[in-house]
Amino acid sequence: MKTSSCKAKGRLGQQEVVKILLKAFPELAEDDIRSTPMGSQGEDIMLSPRARKEFPWDIEVKRGKAFNLVNACKQARARMKPDCGYFPVAMGRYDRDKTWYATVELNYLLELIR
């Protein structure tokens, strides 16, 4: 697959995640959750301060035939500043599958359910 095709698939994946999050949080505006341009450094989904209050995540998005959500979660963790208060979240969808999956670190999951 060409690099341009891979980037297009990644961009579409990011846009899908933005739509899902905006639907789940209707109180947020389109400016609160945005897909970042492909090839730019940092998180794949940019969150406004208002959106960060709802979910303090650093989001890494993967979409394709094969990917590793644990490695994607580690990728998000690696770019975060220590003690920033955000949690790394990896989201991914396989080709020909409509279901999105999310991976978080166990300590964050436990914090959510306590």
For every predicted segment, state its role:
Residues 1-114:
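Catalytic phosphate/metal-binding cores of nucleic-acid and nucleotide-processing enzymes, i.e., regions
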